[in-house]
Structure formats: structure tokens, C-alpha cells
Amino acid sequence: MKPTRKALLTCLLCTPMIVAAQTEEPASDNAGKSNKEEGNRNVMLNASSANGPREIQIGLPSTDVNVLENGLPVTFATNPHSVNSNWRMDASHSHVGLLKISETAITTGNIGYAVNSWTKLGEKGFHGSLNYKTNHFGMQEFSLNVNGSLANNWLYSANVYQDFDPGTFDIKSSKLQDRTQIYKLALTRLYGNGRGQFSAMYHYSNSHPVSNYATQSAPFIYVGDGSVKEYGKFKLGTTSYLPVDANMTYRDMRTGEIGNISLYDAAENRSSQVYLSNKYAWDNGLTWTASARYDHARGAFVYQTPMSLTYVKDNPAYNYKTINALGQRENYTGDYVQSRMSCLNAGDIDELLFTTELSKKFSRSTLRVGFNEWLYNIDYASNTTMYDQSVAADGSYPVRVYDANKRDYYFYDFNKNASEYYKGTENKLAAYLTHDWDITDKLNAYYGARIEWQRLNGENAAVRNAAGDYVGRFSDYHLGATAADGTVIRPVDLNYNWVNYDLTAALTYKINRQFGLTGDFTYIVQHPRFENFSPATLPNTQKITVPLGRAGFYYNNKWLSLTSLFSYISKTNNNSTLNLQHGAEIMAAPMSYDIQTWGWTTDAIIRPFKGFELHALFTYQKPTYKKYETSVTFSDGYTGSINATGNIVAEIPQVLIELDPSYMITPDLKLWTSFRYFSKTYANINDAYYFNGRWESFGGVDWKVNKMLNLGCTVVNFLNQTGAKGSIAGAELITKEDAGNYSNCLMTGSYLRPLTVEFTAKLNF
């Protein structure tokens, strides 16, 4: 498993979710907010990204991002084809909302909330929308949609999205940290008497998400009290930690051939999609919808993961050199050397997704039955390469270095660490049912069930030797290679069939017009995804269970809307692979563990006087590891062990606060701010390192100039907080007892997004 990006925020429950910023009213398509969706989620205010929705992690490890477009997942799996490379919230959308956990579970089988987006499919007449966004670092983002009538009952919609983002610091390996382009063209035929419509759409995207690896890590001094200091003139968030050289040498996992590629080209994602949808409504309240999409794609996700950080100054055990522009070898005179693992994840993908629903409205209820047939075919490999680089205290660009005592060039240990391979199909065939029932004027019940057949068929490289033990990865590993014990690396066949199911039920009782009680329970049963079979060992194939329950009350009056809930969530058999480090050696440690979280959340919207609104949210949670034990033995005989059972889950705060005040100065001018507090988070699994609590801050002005033009200005991190977050590279084996030995030491990890001023304009015509 590769590292994941995490922005640790919160909302109402203890489960992961990604949410979109705003909700627009639908045009002629079948979008629209309903009681399937949550409201009040202003989360395109992303402290980690300038162009994507933030991830909200509450109590469970990150899993696939749940984003739907036109009723279907944007991508079946996010590694190697990430959502942000294929989807942006732009002028092409008529509606963007957030599905509830229960709705996501029943309709997709996934855990957590889901972004629910719908494409503009055209309206009668002519309509246009142009969105523009820039920031003081030079980002340029454009989105144009035009739609209207072609002929009687024929509509069209066309959209262009372009993003040119240089990031918050210059890098030498490419001019931009995000270059994404998305094109959509849709034709719609309206049925007579307003009964529905049939639509066909073509979607093409091309994306180079360089920021995934360009912003992955940076050096800082860990003081020892939860705070960090900058290392010399290296400024977190505005100084590059990528080497100058753009090219990477690797060994192909499939063929064993040595290849060279630029990081920019390695990160390229392409997608060509054909989408069909149909909606038809009868007079008796019966409605039929169907959506289908075929996607032919190349997905890619590149990591440049920091590993060991070594002090080499005046140490005769090391003889580091670099090669200058003239090809001459020079001695490296710096203090530190950072080793990095380059992971070039890529796969050719074909997806065929189909969902259909039949719903019937009765006087006091709505009954719905649905069907999914989702087929995912992939040929995937992750080619990994190790290299070393300088750590420049003067803030200059790093350069690659090599230890002349061990090798004569930069790259080494091809595919030894975390290389991956799998090929084949994953198929999910599911049926589901929901019933939303107003039993009385005061009592509402919502319940549903899903049953799913999941089938995996293909091959991977989890190879065993004659004794039945896993061979594991080794230097120059590839299909066809021979291990030290004589085992030939050949693909291993996979064939699994599982039955998954999900159950959900919710009750809301209105005691009076202002006060009521609410509770819900969702139970999800899953099995491993195809991507879990990518490492050198097979995952735990036992069922994964996720029970989620919450109960509380709500209160509403003219100036206050309040909800307070207690919640519980747990998850069994999380499959993960740790890359454990001892000295300069790295070993992969596959494992399966459980996790549970108790939580309490209070969410309030307060409107004390005209024009002013305050959204306030407080969450206390306690996410803990269960059955979290693993160990590996290194080549020198040292055994590295981890027993994190009972520890607080790394990178997840126990206290979270959100404060979002806004004031309408005039009916057309809005002033707003947003503050988010994250309490202390642990930076490694053993809870040895930690980062102190921090505030994220946003503020801005929105101005509706006239009915055609809207302008906005947003300041990200206006408190100008700097520092580290997330995890510390190479620290998994450090214990609480050892942590005191690492005070005021140089380390690497992720960091806060720097102060950024953004400007937006939206023109409707």
C-alpha cells in the first residue's frame, strides 16, 4: 500500500468523507438535493489543495474517495486513477451535494459520505457560464459551459476545463504542479409531456497531478515538544524538496527492462468516457432511471516517498558524490543525505458501470429498488526505485547524490521496496432496496438493504517458494526474475467470489415542532478490493465489517438549529503494508488490524440577527487501534516489532472545532471567515512523536456585482501558520521510550499549505 494524502478534518460522524463546496440548483437533469443528502458542508476550502475537495477523516483510515457523477463513481478505484485527475467541481455541474452515509452504503457498498454531482445536460434557450480562478502564486483555472436548444426537444451542453497551477514553489522537473484539462459534450432528447429524457455524453480528461509528489514532504527540525522549527533557510510550503533532475530510471515490473521517464510523463492520466442515461416518469408516481458509462483510461499516481535521513558529514563510512552539468563527479560536502523511494504507479484501465433504479412515490412513503453492474479491468504495476539526494540548509534545490563506496550511479534497489503488480477484473453485481416512510406526522423511518456479489479474477506477484513461504521483493525484482533461493517469479492466479451486504435503518421522532430525537445504524460487510492484492503477500481475505451507530437530538427555532449526536464506528481486517526502516534497510511488513472510534459531535447554525450566521461544530472522538501487531527481521538479525493495540490512531486528532461566521453587509456583499482547530495528533503508529494542535484559517469576500457577474476573494491561512502535519518519514519503529533521543533532530514529513490569496470570477450569460 502506498502513502495517502490526508487532511484531517471533521464533520458529524466518525468515518472518512470528502465533500464539495457548494450546491447549485439543477437545470434539466435529474439532479437535485433530497433527504438523501447532507447540507451545510463548505469544504472546497481545502488547506491541502488549491483545486480539490478536502478529505475529512474521522476515526477510520482513509479509503477510496467516494465521488459520484451522474449516479456513478467517478473512478472505480483511486489508485492509480485518482478522482482529482478526472473530476473537478466546475461550470459543467448543475448540482453538487453530499450523500449521507446510509445512502452511500446502500447504493455503492462503500463506507462514508460521497460527493453527489450532476452534469448540466442543457436547458431550452441559450445559457453560458464562465468561471475563472487565480492566486498570487500564478495559478490560472478556467471553466466554460454553454448549453441550450438544438431543435424541438433536443438540447446540448458543452464544457471546457483548463487548469495551469505552478504550485506554491518553483520546481525544476516541470513548469506546473497541476496541468489538467477536461472536455465534455452532451446531447439530450426530452420526452413528451415532461416525462423525462435520454442523454448521451462524451468526456475526455488529461491530467498531470505533479503536486501529489512535489508537495509530499519537506525537512524540518522536530523540537521534541510537538513543535517544529525550519531547517536553515528551507521554508515549509514555499521551498522545493524535489531534486533538479526530472528523469527517473526504473526496472519494468513486467518485462525486467531498464527504462527512463520524466516524473511529469510518469504522472500522466488520460480518460475517454462514453456516458448514457435515461429517466422516465409515469403518472402513477413510478420513475425509472438508468445510467451507464464506459471508460478507457490510463491511470497514474507518482510518489517520491522520503525514507532514511542520514548525517554523513565527516563520516568515513560514506563517500557521497554528485555529477555536475559537465558530467564530472564531485564530492558532496553537505551535512545530510535523504534517501527516497520513487513509486511509479500506472495501469491501463477499462471500466463498464451500469446502475438502474425504479422508485414509486406513495402518499406517505417512497419505495426504491436498484441494481448495479460494475466491471473493472486493469493491468497495473508499480515500479519502484531508490535514490539519495542532498538536504540543503540554504534553501537551494536538492541534487541527487550517490555513495561511491556502494555504487557508481544514483539509482539502486529497483523494485526491492513496495513494488506492486496485479492484472485482471473485479466485478460487482448488486441489488438494493430502500423505503423512506412517514409512519405518522411525528415519526419517520428510513431503512434499506443491499446484497452484492463481488468477483476477482486475475493474477498478481505474491510468489511463494518451495517451502510455501512468500519470497518477497528483492533488488531487480520483476516477472521472470530468479530469487536467491532459486524461485522463479511467475504470476500467481487469483480467483475469489464473495457475498457482501449492507443494512441501514434510521428513526426520527418529532416530540414537538422544535425538538426531536434521531438515531441511525448502518452495518457494512465488505471484502478486499483488487488493489489489496498488489503487494508481495496476499491480504487477509476475511470479511471486513463496519458497524456504525449514532443517536442524539435536534432542536430548531428561528435563530438556532442544533444537532448533538453520540456515535460509534469500528472496522475489522484493515489490510495495510508498512515500509519499516532500520538503518539504511527498508522492509515491507504486511498486516491486518482493527480500529474503533467513540465520538460526540455537536453542530449548530446560529442566526442572532439579520445578515449574520455562525456555523459551529465541536467533535470529541477517540480512535484506537485494535489487534495492531507486526514484526520484521532485517538482514543484520535485528527484529523490528510494533504493538500499537490501544494506541490513538496516528494523524487523527481527538478534538476538532469548526467556526464559520459570515455577514451579509448588503444583499449582494458577503464577508466570511472559517476557522478549523485540530488538537494534538500523533505522527507515528507507536504514538512516540506528535504535533501540537493547530488552526487552519480562511477568509474572504463574495460580491454579486449584478445578475451576470460574481466576484470573490479568498485568503487561505490568513493567520499564516507554518509547520508540519501528518506523519514523520521512517519513524514507524520509534517507541515512546526512544522518542526523547530525537529532540531537535532533522526529520521529514508533510506540512501546512502557506498563506495564499485567491481571486474568483463567475460570468453567466
Task: Specify the residue positions occupied by each region the protein language model found.
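Gram-negative outer-membrane beta-barrel transporters
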Residues: D441-K442, W559-S561, S567-T572, P590-I685, ...
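Acidic, small-polar-rich N-terminal luminal/periplasmic segments of exported/outer-membrane proteins
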Residues: Q22-G125, I524
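Repeated loop/turn-to-beta-strand initiation elements of outer-membrane beta-barrel proteins
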Residues: F126-H127, N153-Y156, N193-F198, G285-W288, ...
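Structural signature of Gram-negative outer-membrane beta-barrels, strongest in the C-terminal barrel
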Residues: G347-E351, K361-R407, F411-T572, W598, ...
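C-terminal beta-signal and adjacent terminal beta-strands/loops
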Residues: Q22-E24, K680-Y682, V701-F765
